[in-house]
């Protein structure tokens, strides 16, 4: 059966120890898949998916981004990348994991999978580091009009000026996610939009490393990332 191995490496920011996982198959390796997770979650949520792929011959690796999961050093850091240039730090950490893993499995195809915010990071990565990738898989992505993104970035900047980049902003969080449940007639929780599987919704809500309110800093970073991949 597949086996998991947890490890850490030094982030590009020079301060944090990035938490990462590798799931390896019990048998021949067909390919490698690297996962970039979404905002306000962490890689342990992907364990069943990683194990499923490993059962089909994939080595699967993933890391908790800065400000997420076990890479975050405290609750205040959740949903916060960095004081400056956080988006590029996170992409560079993904590149570090790619290089570490590709060196171990140099003779098989290497794929990058990104979900939600991870899809934006993956699109950035493909622009900046296309070498060594066989392909990219984009899940739960999107692209708002340029004017909307610019306005969101400005609002985040103003929030940073008023309250600091680590401020967990109810205003920005509502703007980003507040309308998602409106698409459904009957909702049980404010996070029903995440999945139709009620058990998974409940697990997410109960997880202290999931669902942190977006900080002004990460919102500003994401808007900058969206402008870059436009």
Tell me the role of every PLM-derived stretch:
Residues 82-103:
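Alpha/beta-hydrolase active-site loop
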Residues 33, 37-41, 116-117:
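Active-site glycine-rich loops that stabilize anionic/oxyanionic intermediates
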Residues 105-116:
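Alpha/beta-hydrolase fold nucleophile elbow
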Residues 124-209:
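Alpha/beta-hydrolase-fold enzymes
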Residues 215-230:
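Active-site nucleophile elbow and catalytic-triad environment of alpha/beta-hydrolase enzymes
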Residues 114-124:
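Glycine-rich nucleophile elbow surrounding the catalytic serine of serine-hydrolase chemistry
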Residues 45-77:
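Conserved alpha/beta-hydrolase
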Residues 1-27:
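N-terminal cap/lid segment of alpha/beta-hydrolase-fold proteins
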């Amino acid at each position: 059966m597949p086996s998991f191995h947890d490890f850490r490496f030094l982030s590009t920011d020079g301060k944090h120890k990035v938490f990462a996982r590798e799931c390896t198959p019990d048998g021949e390796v067909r390919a490698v898949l690297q996962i970039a997770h979404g905002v306000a979650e962490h890689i342990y949520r992907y364990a069943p998916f990683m194990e499923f792929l490993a059962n089909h011959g994939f080595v699967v690796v993933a890391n908790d981004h800065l400000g997420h999961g076990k890479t975050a050093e405290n609750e205040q850091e959740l949903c916060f990348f960095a004081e400056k240039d956080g988006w590029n730090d996170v992409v560079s950490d993904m590149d570090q994991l790619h290089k570490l893993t590709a060196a171990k499995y140099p003779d098989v195809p290497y794929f990058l999978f990104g979900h939600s915010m991870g899809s934006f990071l993956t699109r950035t990565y493909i622009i900046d580091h296309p070498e060594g990738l066989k392909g990219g898989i984009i899940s739960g992505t999107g692209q708002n009009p340029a004017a909307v993104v610019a306005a969101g970035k400005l609002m985040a900047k103003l929030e940073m000026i008023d309250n600091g980049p680590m401020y967990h902003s109810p205003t920005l969080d509502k703007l980003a996610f507040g309308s998602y449940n409106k698409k459904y007639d009957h909702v049980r929780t404010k996070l029903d939009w995440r999945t139709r599987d009620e058990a998974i919704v409940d697990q997410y809500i109960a997880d202290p490393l999931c669902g942190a309110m977006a900080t002004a800093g990460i919102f500003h970073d994401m808007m900058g990332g969206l402008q870059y991949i436009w």
